[in-house]
C-alpha cells in the first residue's frame, strides 16, 4: 500500500495555497467545503478567487512566496505553472514537516487528493496512488450511481441515535445487528423517500419493542426498453430487491440489472392476454411484503401511465402495506425521442395527448372530436389492434386523412423499427408491426427522416413503401 487513506479534519485549520489560477481555484473549492481557513499567495487572482476574497471567504497574500508563510499552517498546496517555485514550496514544507501537495506532480507530494463521492457525513475516497487518475474518476462515477443522495442524511440520523442505542444495547454484536436491520429495512426506505420523521419513529419503535422484518412494495418504472434509460433510483432499488414481479414489456437488459439472488416472477400482460390476473398480482405483492421482503414491481415505461400501477398501490394501501414509487421514462417520450419525432414543435404541435387504445369495455368512449384537433400530437399506447377504428374515427371527426403517422415498434431497443405513413394507412402500418408498438399521429412525424439519429432506426420511406405494397 503506497498511501495510507486518512481523512483530515480541516475545520478552522489554516491552509496555504501557492498560486491564484484556475487549478488553485479547484483545490480551494474543495478546501472550503471541508471548512478550511484558506490563505492564497499570488501576485494576481483568478476572478472567482478575487470575488471570494472580497466576500471574506479567503485571505489573499498579494506577494511572492516566502518560507515564513509556512510557519503557522496545517498543510500546503502548490498550484503554479512555475516548476522551480513548486519545487521550492515542496522543499520548504518538507523541512517544516508540513503536509504538502504539488498539483499534478506526484513525486513532490506528501499527500494526494483522491476522487471523492460526497454523501456527507458519509465520504467515499478512491485513489490509484497517482498511477491512473482517469480510472479512479471512472470508478467514482460508478459508485456515484449506486449510492443514493439520502445516505448522508441517513448517516446523520443514525449518528443522533448512537448514544441511546449504545445505552440500550450493551453488546457490540447486538448493536451491529440493530444497525444492519435498520440500514436494510424500513428505516432506510423512509430516509430514501425523504420522510425523516417516520424513519426516526421506526428506530424509536425498534428500540422500545423489536419487530420482525418489515417488508414493502416499490413500484419501479423500467423505461421503454433501453437499459440506459433506467433511472439511478430505479437501479438502486432493484439492487435491494428480494423479489421482483415484472411484465413482458421489461427488456432483458433491464432485468439483467436486478440483484442476482432476487426471486424473479413474470406476471406479464399483453393487450387482451394476462399471464397472471391483476387481482392475483396485487395479492402476491401484498403477501411477499408481509413476509418482510422488499418487493419490486417492475413495469415497462412509467408505472402511472397506462401501467395499472395506481390499482396495485390502492390494494397495498388497503392492506396496510407500505410502498414507494420510482417513476420511469414513458414510451411516448422515449420511443419518439429515439425515432427523431419531437412530441411538440412550435411549427407543428402545441400540445401532446397520451391515449390508450386498450380501454375497459364499459368505459366512456373517447372524445374523438377533441382527439381529432389539428396542431397536436397523439401518442397512442396499445393501439395496434384498434388502428383501423382509430384511423376511421379521427378522419370522421375532422382530422385530415393525409396527417403524418408513425408506428414505432420496440422503441429504444436494438431492433427498433419506425414505420411512417398517413392517417388513412395507419391500419396497414400497424397490422404487422412487432410488439410493443406506439402509434404517433401528428404533423411532427414528418421530422422523422430529418431528425432520426438512433443507429437502428429504419429508413422510414422504404419501410412505408414495402408495407403499403404488401397490402
From Swiss-Prot:
Pathway as given in its UniProt record: Cofactor biosynthesis; adenosylcobalamin biosynthesis; precorrin-2 from uroporphyrinogen III: step 1/1; Cofactor biosynthesis; adenosylcobalamin biosynthesis; sirohydrochlorin from precorrin-2: step 1/1; Porphyrin-containing compound metabolism; siroheme biosynthesis; precorrin-2 from uroporphyrinogen III: step 1/1; Porphyrin-containing compound metabolism; siroheme biosynthesis; siroheme from sirohydrochlorin: step 1/1
Cited CDD domains: SUMT (cd11642)
Active site: 247 (proton acceptor), 269 (proton donor)
Region (Precorrin-2 dehydrogenase /sirohydrochlorin ferrochelatase): 1-203
Domain of life: Bacteria
Keywords: Cobalamin biosynthesis, Lyase, Methyltransferase, Multifunctional enzyme, NAD, Oxidoreductase, Phosphoprotein, Porphyrin biosynthesis, S-adenosyl-L-methionine, Transferase
Gene3D superfamilies in the cross-refs: Cobalt-precorrin-4 Transmethylase, Domain 1 (3.40.1010.10), Methyltransferase, Cobalt-precorrin-4 Transmethylase, Domain 2 (3.30.950.10), NAD(P)-binding Rossmann-like Domain (3.40.50.720), Sirohaem synthase, dimerisation domain (1.10.8.210), Siroheme synthase, domain 2 (3.30.160.110)
InterPro entries listed in its UniProt record: 4pyrrol_Mease, 4pyrrol_Methylase_sf, 4pyrrole_Mease_sub1, 4pyrrole_Mease_sub2, CobA/CysG_C, NAD(P)-bd_dom_sf, Siro_Cobalamin_biosynth, Sirohaem_synt_dimer_dom_sf
Residues reported in the UniProt entry to bind NAD(+): 22-23, 43-44
Residue positions, PTM Phosphoserine: 128
GO terms for MF: NAD binding; precorrin-2 dehydrogenase activity; sirohydrochlorin ferrochelatase activity; uroporphyrin-III C-methyltransferase activity
Catalytic activity: uroporphyrinogen III + 2 S-adenosyl-L-methionine = precorrin-2 + 2 S-adenosyl-L-homocysteine + H(+); precorrin-2 + NAD(+) = sirohydrochlorin + NADH + 2 H(+); siroheme + 2 H(+) = sirohydrochlorin + Fe(2+)
Region (Uroporphyrinogen-III C-methyltransferase): 215-471
Binding site for S-adenosyl-L-methionine: 224, 300-302, 305, 330-331, 382, 411
One BP annotation, GO: siroheme biosynthetic process
EC id: 2.1.1.107, 1.3.1.76, 4.99.1.4
Pfam families referenced in this protein's UniProt entry, alphabetically: CysG_dimeriser, NAD_binding_7, Sirohm_synth_M, TP_methylase
General function of this protein: Then it catalyzes the NAD-dependent ring dehydrogenation of precorrin-2 to yield sirohydrochlorin. Finally, it catalyzes the ferrochelation of sirohydrochlorin to yield siroheme.
Family membership noted in the UniProt record: In the N-terminal section; belongs to the precorrin-2 dehydrogenase / sirohydrochlorin ferrochelatase family. In the C-terminal section; belongs to the precorrin methyltransferase family.
Protein name: Siroheme synthase 1
Organism listed in the record: Cronobacter sakazakii (strain ATCC BAA-894)
Designated gene of the protein: cysG1
Amino acid at each position: 500500500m503506497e498511501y495510507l487513506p486518512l481523512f483530515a479534519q480541516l475545520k478552522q485549520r489554516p491552509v496555504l495555497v501557492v498560486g491564484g489560477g484556475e487549478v488553485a481555484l479547484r483545490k480551494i473549492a474543495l478546501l472550503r467545503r471541508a471548512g478550511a481557513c484558506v490563505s492564497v499567495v499570488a501576485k494576481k487572482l483568478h476572478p472567482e478567487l478575487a470575488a471570494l476574497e472580497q466576500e471574506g471567504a479567503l485571505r489573499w497574500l498579494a506577494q511572492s512566496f516566502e518560507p515564513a508563510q509556512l510557519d503557522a499552517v496545517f498543510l500546503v498546496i502548490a498550484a503554479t505553472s512555475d516548476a522551480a517555485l513548486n519545487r521550492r514550496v515542496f522543499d520548504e514544507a518538507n523541512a517544516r514537516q508540513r503536509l504538502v501537495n504539488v498539483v499534478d506532480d506526484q513525486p513532490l507530494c506528501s499527500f494526494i487528493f483522491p476522487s471523492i463521492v460526497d454523501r456527507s457525513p458519509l465520504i467515499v475516497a478512491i485513489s490509484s496512488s497517482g498511477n491512473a487518475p482517469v480510472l479512479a474518476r471512472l470508478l467514482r462515477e460508478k459508485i456515484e450511481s449506486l449510492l443514493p443522495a439520502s445516505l448522508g442524511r441517513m448517516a446523520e440520523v443514525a449518528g443522533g441515535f448512537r448514544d441511546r442505542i449504545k445505552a440500550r444495547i450493551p453488546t457490540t454484536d447486538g448493536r451491529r445487528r440493530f444497525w444492519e436491520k435498520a440500514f436494510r429495512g424500513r428505516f432506510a426506505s423512509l430516509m430514501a423517500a425523504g420522510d425523516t420523521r417516520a424513519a426516526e419513529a421506526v428506530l424509536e419503535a425498534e428500540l422500545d419493542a423489536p419487530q420482525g422484518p418489515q417488508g414493502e412494495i416499490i413500484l419501479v418504472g423500467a423505461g421503454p426498453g433501453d437499459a440506459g434509460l433506467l433511472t439511478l433510483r430505479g437501479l438502486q432499488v432493484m439492487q435491494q430487491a428480494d423479489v421482483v414481479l415484472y411484465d413482458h414489456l421489461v427488456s432483458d437488459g433491464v432485468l439483467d440489472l436486478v440483484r442476482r439472488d432476487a426471486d424473479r416472477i413474470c406476471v406479464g400482460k399483453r393487450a387482451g392476454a394476462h399471464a397472471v390476473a391483476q387481482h392475483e398480482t396485487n395479492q402476491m405483492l401484498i403477501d411477499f411484503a408481509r413476509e418482510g421482503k422488499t418487493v419490486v414491481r417492475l413495469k415497462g415505461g412509467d408505472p402511472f401511465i397506462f401501467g395499472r400501477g395506481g390499482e396495485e398501490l390502492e390494494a397495498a394501501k388497503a392492506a396496510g402495506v407500505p410502498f414507494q414509487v420510482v417513476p420511469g421514462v414513458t414510451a411516448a417520450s422515449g420511443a419518439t425521442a429515439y425515432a427523431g419525432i419531437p412530441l411538440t414543435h412550435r411549427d407543428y404541435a402545441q400540445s401532446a395527448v397520451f391515449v390508450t387504445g386498450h380501454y375497459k369495455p364499459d368505459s366512456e368512449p373517447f372524445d374523438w372530436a377533441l382527439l381529432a384537433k389539428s396542431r397536436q400530437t397523439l401518442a397512442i399506447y396499445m393501439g395496434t389492434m384498434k388502428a383501423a377504428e382509430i384511423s376511421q374515427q379521427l378522419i370522421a371527426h375532422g382530422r385530415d386523412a393525409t396527417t403524418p403517422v408513425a408506428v414505432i415498434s420496440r422503441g429504444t431497443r436494438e431492433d427498433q423499427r419506425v414505420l411512417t405513413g398517413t392517417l388513412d394507412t395507419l391500419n396497414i402500418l400497424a397490422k404487422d408491426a412487432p410488439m410493443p408498438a406506439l402509434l404517433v399521429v401528428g404533423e411532427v412525424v414528418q421530422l422523422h427522416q430529418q431528425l432520426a439519429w438512433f443507429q437502428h432506426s429504419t429508413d422510414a420511406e422504404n419501410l412505408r413503401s414495402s408495407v403499403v405494397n404488401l397490402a
